[in-house]
């Protein structure tokens, strides 16, 4: 499967530490999960079902649709395109992270373009994102990174996406009258919803939120629209 093959390639480190440079480019081949190209006057009644994606792909494709609705769909990944961990130690010029929720076993090749830190003091994002310049894998799924952090962040959760942009979870392109009701996105290897050259998109009760037990969801923007 091409989606799993791409995931394996990226996670091996073959695309480097910023994989979007290799795959977030015009005409890069990609897999579509649910493809509704050309559909008209249709409603998808998901009733809370989860579309669990196996490999890196575009979850839902709405190309040239008209009067199309999706109700009650959740989108997530079988293996998340990000890893979460806990900061276990902070020194003057480095810090150590144990990845208790790794996408797979962490190696020196695993791509980490940045890290987001959940600051328990404010119950929100720490003010800065950090590049992840690792020094060593010091134990299974335990990595020492270069960088300076305040000591109080010991015990904080970090979310480490394995790429920035790739395909969106839902892509709406050259479509008219699209409605998303109670749609949830728990994770994606890029943006949540992207609309391009599209008229009249209605989103009711959209939830771009972490899956249960996680602090972070999509790797980049929740939504992004362009004319």
Task: Go through each PLM region and give its residues.
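Extended Gly/Ser/Thr-rich low-complexity repeat segments
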Residues: 74-76, 103-131, 149-169, 175
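Extracellular beta-strand-rich solenoid/capping regions of secreted or surface-exposed proteins
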Residues: 3-43, 52-71, 78-95, 163-176, ...
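Generic recognition of long tandem-repeat/solenoid scaffolds
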Residues: 93-101, 137-150
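Short, exposed beta-strand/loop patches in secreted or surface proteins that constitute
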Residues: 44, 83-91, 124-138
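Long amphipathic alpha-helical scaffold regions
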Residues: 6, 198-227
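All-beta strand scaffolds that present successive hydrophobic residues in beta-strands
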Residues: 43-46, 67-72, 155-159, 178-182, ...
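Generic short beta-strand segments
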Residues: 1-11, 100, 150, 207
């Amino acid at each position: 499967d091409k989606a799993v093959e791409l995931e394996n390639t990226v996670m091996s480190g073959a695309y480097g530490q910023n994989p979007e440079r290799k795959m977030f480019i015009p005409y890069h081949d990609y897999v579509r999960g649910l493809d509704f190209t050309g559909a008209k006057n249709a409603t998808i009644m998901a009733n809370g079902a989860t579309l669990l994606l196996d490999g890196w792909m575009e979850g839902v494709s709405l190309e040239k649709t008209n009067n199309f609705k999706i109700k009650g769909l959740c989108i997530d990944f079988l293996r998340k395109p990000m890893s979460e961990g806990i900061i276990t130690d902070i020194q003057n010029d480095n810090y150590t992270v144990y990845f208790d929720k790794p996408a797979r076993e962490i190696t020196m090749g695993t791509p980490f373009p940045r890290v987001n830190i959940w600051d328990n003091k404010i119950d929100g994002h720490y003010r800065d994102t950090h590049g992840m310049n690792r020094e060593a894998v010091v134990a299974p799924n335990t990595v020492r990174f270069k960088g300076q952090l305040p000591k109080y962040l010991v015990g904080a959760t970090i979310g480490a996406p394995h790429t920035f942009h790739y395909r969106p979870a839902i892509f709406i392109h050259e479509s008219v009258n699209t409605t998303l009701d109670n749609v949830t996105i728990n994770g994606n290897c890029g943006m949540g919803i992207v609309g391009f050259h599209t008229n009249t998109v209605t989103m009711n009760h959209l939830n771009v939120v972490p899956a249960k037990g996680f602090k972070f969801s999509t790797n980049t923007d929740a939504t992004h629209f362009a004319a």
